[in-house]
Amino acid sequence: MIYFCTADLRRGYSLLQRGHRLEKRLITNLGGISFLDCVEECLRTTRCLSVNYFQPAHFCEVNYKKKESLPDLYFVNSGWYYSERDDWDKAIAGPCSNPNCKENEKCVPKAFGNIKCEISDCGIPTNEGISFENVQDGDAIGINRKMHITCLDGYERQGSEVFICQPNGVWKADLICKKTNLST
């Protein structure tokens, strides 16, 4: 189905940050799509706050954080573009411009202007004592993705440091971080 789009793109393009990338806070990534398709994916994904786009390879990264909250992970990076969700007209998302999807869902357009909310991610792990220090470039919280998570200093690790996001939106993980008892 073809939709007539009346979205204003000027503001979004004027605020685009060329040569920058926010690292290690991905929901998912997609290859072979245009920059505007990348922005639309963000607008349809409830948890998305920003995107990175690598122009030479038409590669999109959908982020769950903004640069303001993680300045240490925001880098100058040639070929990349960084943009925030709030900079874009929601009308780009067509029938998904005002969905009522849950935080870990994304809006998927269907025939005749209908929409469907589908699970997009497992959320940000909140287990006691965990650290995102070992998250690797390419790790993500999206469905069928994995993250490398370890324990904070002062905690003992039991189990694997690899969390896998299952299709039902629940992490598969056996990492337990137990507070160590240090005698002084």
What function would you assign to each model-found segment?
Residues 1-7:
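Cleavable N-terminal signal peptides of Sec/SRP-targeted secreted and luminal proteins
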Residues 14-66:
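N-terminal "mature ectodomain cap" immediately after the signal peptide
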Residues 57, 61, 70, 79-81, ...:
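A sequence-level detector of short, solvent-exposed, charge-rich linear segments
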